């Protein structure tokens, strides 16, 4: 098998039978502890938005975009929990699964492509979420009209633009490489200069820049609203800070594989931290949204204490509607 990618030059072939499986199994159990609740929350949110309360959420552009983000996060979490993290952190399965992933190349290529497609999509989705909030504050009277015409273009752009990131993965060969006693997936880079890590990092850097810019404008404009909206401003500030910090940390680790000289001594650690950074993003995004939107919080947890109060503004959209 031709292994001409820089990624494959760092990792070794085959299973490392000298690795102690217990610490790796504990890593998987730890990740299982927060991934399962994350998957459940995403399923709950999507069932509410797409089915139970579709007439409420699917007429609002912000929640249409967020539902796409939730689908992307959910897909990544499912692939991580049942495939990616299993083959990495359960070394006992490596001797059986490694040959299958090595010889049946179509399956790992599909998994690898879908996973990185969703990762790229999240960067684009983040841009539209923050632009949507900014538009709501800058043009409250024309906000709904603008996004009613713009949302089909938004959906198409979110759907198609990730192919700019993964096109080289699709046409290249995917293969297993050893890591943490198990193995992960790499690709040969048929087009040598088209690095997946570089494309991913570029997308995330653009997303982070636009997020900071649009959120700053949104917060500046919100300061002119009534004092009763100060709690909403603090909530939005927290949400924006969280999303920006999560994207920044993920982009930082992405840049390690994209641009810096990498050695085996540090690659395992950075690979682990990179996965954790994306976990924070995928698991944290629905939690942040539930904290922001009182209506969504009440639908997710239908108890009276969670019901939104009329005097409390919990989202940018509701801020404009109540002023």
From Swiss-Prot:
Topological type in the membrane: Multi-pass membrane protein
One Gene Ontology MF term: transmembrane signaling receptor activity
Transmembrane as UniProt keyword: yes
Highest taxon above the source species: Eukaryota
Disulfide bond sites: none
GO biological process: one example: sensory perception of chemical stimulus
Any single Gene Ontology cellular-component annotation: membrane
Record key words, sorted: Membrane, Transmembrane, Transmembrane helix
Transmembrane residue ranges: 31-51, 63-83, 98-117, 151-171, 193-213, 245-265, 272-292
Family: Belongs to the nematode receptor-like protein srg family.
Protein's name in the database: Serpentine receptor class gamma-5
Lineage of producing organism: Eukaryota, Metazoa, Ecdysozoa, Nematoda, Chromadorea
């Amino acid at each position: 098998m031709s292994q001409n990618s820089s990624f494959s030059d760092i990792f070794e072939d085959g299973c490392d039978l000298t690795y102690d499986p217990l610490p790796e199994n504990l890593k998987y159990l730890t990740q299982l502890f927060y991934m399962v609740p994350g998957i459940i929350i995403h399923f709950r949110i999507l069932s509410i938005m797409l089915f139970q309360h579709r007439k409420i959420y699917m007429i609002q552009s912000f929640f249409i975009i967020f539902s796409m983000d939730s689908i992307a996060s959910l897909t990544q979490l499912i692939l991580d929990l049942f495939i990616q993290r299993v083959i990495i952190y359960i070394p006992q399965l490596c001797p059986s699964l490694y040959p299958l992933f090595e010889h049946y190349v179509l399956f790992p290529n599909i998994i690898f492509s879908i996973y990185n497609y969703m990762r790229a999509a999240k960067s684009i989705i983040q841009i539209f979420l923050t632009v949507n909030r900014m538009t709501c504050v800058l043009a409250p009277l024309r906000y709904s009209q603008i996004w009613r015409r713009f949302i089909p273009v938004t959906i198409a752009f979110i759907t198609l633009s990730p192919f700019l990131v993964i096109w080289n993965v699709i046409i290249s060969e995917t293969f297993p490489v050893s890591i943490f006693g198990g193995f992960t997936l790499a690709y040969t880079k048929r087009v040598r200069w088209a690095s997946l890590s570089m494309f991913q990092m570029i997308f995330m850097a653009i997303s982070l820049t636009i997020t900071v810019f649009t959120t700053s404008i949104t917060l500046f404009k919100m300061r002119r609203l009534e004092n009763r909206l100060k709690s909403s401003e603090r909530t939005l500030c927290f949400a924006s800070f969280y999303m920006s910090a999560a994207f920044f940390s993920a982009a930082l680790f992405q840049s390690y594989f994209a641009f810096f000289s990498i050695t085996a001594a540090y690659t395992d650690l950075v690979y682990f931290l990179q996965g954790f950074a994306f976990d924070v993003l995928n698991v944290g995004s629905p939690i942040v949204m539930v904290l922001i939107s009182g209506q969504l919080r009440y639908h997710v947890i239908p108890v009276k204490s969670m019901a939104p109060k009329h005097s409390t503004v919990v989202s940018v959209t509701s801020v404009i509607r109540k002023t």
